[in-house]
A protein has these predicted regions:
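Structural alpha-beta junctions
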Residues: 1-3, 120-134, 164-170
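Short amphipathic alpha-helical segments that mediate assembly, nucleic-acid/protein binding
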Residues: 34-37, 41, 55-61, 111, ...
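A generic structural motif
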Residues: 141-148
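Long, distal/terminal scaffolding or interaction modules
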Residues: 228-295
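DNA replication initiation modules
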Residues: 6-14, 82-109, 149-232
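Short beta-strand
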Residues: 133-140, 171-176
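Short amphipathic alpha-helix segments
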Residues: 105-129
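DNA replication initiation on ssDNA origins
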Residues: 1-99, 222-225
């Protein structure tokens, strides 16, 4: 089956930052393969002079480089479509969520190590196995790492966990639904998986959406996760596991001895048996483990 790719992109230089359009990957490839973008990237990195800017004026050069960077075409990695082509959070269409995100590595000294570590994580036996989708140098020769989000994990959770595994600081500005990434030239692309910006198979989409819904989130993983009944039970069970039931039984027996005189000893014994049975039932429930659900 043919893999369909979709990308929310503004392919124009000096494009309106509030507008993005849904295209196939050939538009993306056309932009990063253009000579104009290549020249802009070289100028931003100081590899080529900028017309009308004195190379001896460091402040002027820096300002001109920032201006050029702001003029680059851009795309949004989290969603393939925005309502009315307006790039804002509430316009991100949930059904176009791509279940991917981009990690920023802003420390130039760590870029090459991060590339190696990302590849290592991709081949590991943990949750990041097969997660690597894209590696690309940013406009200032830092690093963008595109990854597949583990099933059930939100953008924020994915970013935090991956940054920890990678050994880089977590950046909360990277988790917004409408986040934009400036495009760089083809030579800056280090690696691209065939599943980068791909529409996942319907069965996987449904499984991922359900994993979010089970947590009380929207189908694209937004909102505050609610504590459902199973989670509430888990919390109660955790609390019970901290209780010393032998101490409770001893206290109950002492109270029964004080409350009941010898003629009522039979009643006391019956109550003790009943309480012991209840405590045993609670302990059995505490130690019971719910079977793992396989998707």
């Amino acid at each position: 089956m043919e893999i369909v790719h979709v990308v929310a992109i503004n392919p124009y230089r000096k494009g309106n930052k509030g507008k993005v359009f849904s295209y196939r990957m050939d538009t993306y490839d056309k932009v990063i393969g253009s000579e104009e973008i290549k020249k802009m990237i070289q100028q931003i990195r100081g590899e080529l002079p900028i017309d009308g800017v004195d190379l001896n004026d460091a402040q002027a050069v820096k300002k001109a480089q920032e201006r050029l960077k702001s003029e680059l075409p851009f795309f949004c990695p989290h969603y393939g479509m925005f309502k009315n082509n307006v790039r804002r959070q509430e316009n991100a269409l949930p059904e176009s969520f791509l279940f991917q995100t981009i990690i920023d590595v802003d420390d130039k000294e760590y870029v090459e190590k991060a590339i190696e570590k990302a590849r290592e994580l991709n081949c590991s036996s943990g949750i990041w196995n097969g997660s690597l989708l894209h590696l690309c140098y940013s406009a200032r020769k830092k690093l963008h790492i595109g990854i597949r989000m583990p099933i059930g994990m939100t953008i924020e959770e994915t970013q935090k966990a991956y940054c920890e595994a990678l050994g880089v600081p977590y950046d909360e500005s990277c988790i917004t639904p409408e986040r934009m990434i400036f495009l760089t030239d083809k030579d800056s692309e280090i690696y691209r998986s065939k599943m980068w910006c791909a529409v996942l198979p319907e069965s996987e989409i449904q499984a991922r959406r359900q994993a979010f819904l089970d947590r009380g989130l929207t189908v694209d993983g937004r909102g505050d996760a609610k504590v459902n009944s199973l989670q509430l039970i888990a919390i109660v069970m955790t609390m019970f596991k901290t209780i010393d039931f032998r101490a409770i039984v001893a206290i109950m027996l002492l109270l029964l001895a004080l409350l009941f005189s010898l003629p009522n000893l039979v009643i006391a014994i019956m109550l003790m048996i009943l309480i012991s049975g209840i405590l045993e039932a609670i302990m059995a429930l505490v130690n019971w483990e719910r079977p793992v659900r396989r998707i």
